[in-house]
Design a protein with these regions (language model features):
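Cys/His-rich zinc-coordinating modules
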Residues: 4-9, 13, 19-73, 77-85, ...
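Core mature regions of organelle-targeted
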Residues: 83-97, 103, 113, 120-123
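Structured beta-strand/turn binding interfaces of compact recognition modules in eukaryotic regulators
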Residues: 98-101, 114-116, 230-233, 246-248
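Short, basic interhelical loop/turn and adjoining N-cap
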Residues: 104, 236
Length: 329
């Protein structure tokens, strides 16, 4: 009996080890632990890493992305011209103390203003006349000599020019943006006919979509960074070291930027605004802010001029939604 028990125990151990070696035990995968460690000599790897970085720099700019950059610059120019023309017929109001804007002759009464330096909360806006920069928010970045140059230090922050982030992205893609800069007032001050307004609005909205899709394609190839705590953008594989984050009293972070991956909205801010629909009151009130639509400013401006809005924005526009809590009773 003892010999039989010993044989059964040895057979059980043998089956258990075979199960472990095959990597499966009770439905779970079991991986044997490594019994040795691999030592890496960083002194030998450092020259290889530097050589790989130099070879990578020779691969840029990517030829296939040059037409995309050209298309982005053309779309940006058409967008500036179109918005400048539409603003002659549709005024924009901007808050005096916060970034809020509203496309109408009068502002709204929605209490979302945080005041100067964020010292207030949920107060009414104080409206003044807005302009092109309130709709197309300018985003600037440092202009690099080449894509893989050294990191800009704090004491070098005045040695580099500040240009548009779109221009810098297209310049790194192999296109010189200097010949594509246009003036925002190139359309003149003449008012357009309703037919011309609709044509300009459709062309402007198409340019907006082309610009954003082109920037998205470029960001897949050319890296860009944005600070987690402020709106600073850097086009390049790594951010700069200029300690400019938190220079305002209401910002919690002080010193160097905390860089994360930049998205399309960081380089081309959509500037979300409240949209007044036909069923809404003449002046939007605070009680109905949960019912009003919230759309990009470009979309609202072009829709007022008669442009066809893409279906993907229907949920943001709330075109068939209720006007306020009074209609829910």
């Amino acid at each position: 009996m003892k010999e039989k028990g010993f044989v059964d125990s040895m057979a059980l151990r043998k089956n258990l080890w075979q199960t472990v070696l095959h990597g499966e035990f009770d439905g779970y995968l079991v991986y044997p632990r490594r019994l040795c460690t691999t030592k890496v000599d960083l002194k030998k790897l450092r020259p290889m890493i530097y050589e790989r970085i130099e070879k990578r720099a020779n691969e840029y700019p990517v030829r296939a992305m040059v037409p995309v950059a050209v298309e982005v610059l053309k779309a940006r120019n058409v967008l500036i011209q179109g918005v400048s023309a539409l603003l002659q017929s549709f005024p924009v109001m901007a808050c005096k103390f916060c970034p809020e804007i509203f496309i109408d002759e009068k502002g709204h009464l929605i209490r979302t203003c945080h005041g100067y330096k964020r010292h207030a909360k949920n107060r009414c806006h104080e409206w003044v006349a807005g302009g092109l920069d309130d709709i197309l928010v300018p985003v600037e970045t440092y202009h690099l000599n080449n894509m893989f140059q050294g990191v800009i230090k704090h004491n070098q922050r005045f040695d580099f020019d500040r240009i548009s982030a779109i221009d810098e992205l297209c310049w790194q893609a192999g296109v010189d943006p200097c010949g594509n800069i246009v003036s925002g007032n190139s359309q003149g001050s003449e008012f357009l006919s309703p037919y011309d307004l609709t044509f300009v609005a459709n062309r402007t909205l198409t340019a907006w979509e082309t610009l954003r899709s082109g920037v998205l394609k470029l960001l897949f190839v050319y890296p860009a960074k944005v600070c987690k705590y402020c709106s600073e953008v850097h086009v390049g594989p790594s951010g700069h070291k200029a300690r400019l984050c938190g220079v305002f009293n209401y910002e919690s972070w002080r010193g160097a930027h905390f860089w994360t991956k930049a998205e399309v909205d960081d380089l081309v801010p959509p500037k979300i605004v409240w949209r007044r629909r036909p069923q809404d009151p003449p002046i939007l009130v605070d009680e109905g802010k949960g019912y009003y639509g919230r759309v990009p400013a470009i979309l609202d401006l072009c829709a007022k001029a008669g442009a066809l809005v893409p279906a993907k924005y229907n949920s943001m526009m709330k075109a068939q939604g209720l006007s306020g809590p009074a209609f829910c009773r």
